[in-house]
Amino acid sequence: MLKTLLLWTAVGVAGAAQAAPNLARHADLDLATARQLADATLKHCTGALSVLDRGGNVLMAQRPEGVGPHNLLASQRKAYTALSTKTPTRLFAERARNNPEAANLNSIAELLLLGGGVPLFAEGELVGALGVAGAGGAEQDEACAIQATGQVGLTIQR
C-alpha cells in the first residue's frame, strides 16, 4: 500500500512539473537604473522627470528646485504616453495632429501629447519610459530624455 501511494505521488509530482506553462522571461527596469536615468537627465537639463517600469508604475520622480510643480505630473504623463504608444511623445503628437481620427486622444486624461516622453528599450524589449517636463519646451525636454537614455545604455526604439 505504501509503495503504491509513493508511486502515485511521484507520478503526480512529475506530471505537475511537466504541465507548468512555459512563460516568457522579460527584462525589467530596476530602481538602480531609474536612478542612473534621473542623474543623467539632470546632467543634461533642469526639468522634472519620471521613470516608469513596463507596467506604468513610477520607479523614480524628481522635480528640481525652481521647476514648476505642474511639471512633475506632466513628466509622468509624458512617460505614460511614450510607454503606452511605444513611441516618443513628440513624434506621436505630430502624427496625431496630422490624423483627424486621432483628435480625441487629447481627451484621455493619462496621455499628454507633448514632446519629452520616450519609451525605453533594452535589447529590443520595452522595459519602461522616461518623461521630462519643464526644461524649456517640448524640444528641449525630448533632447534631454534622449541624451539621458543613451547615456545609461538604453534606446528609444526597438
Protein language model annotation of sequence segments:
Residues 3-15:
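Bacterial N-terminal signal peptides
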Residues 19-158:
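Flexible, solvent-exposed loop/hinge segments and secondary-structure transition points
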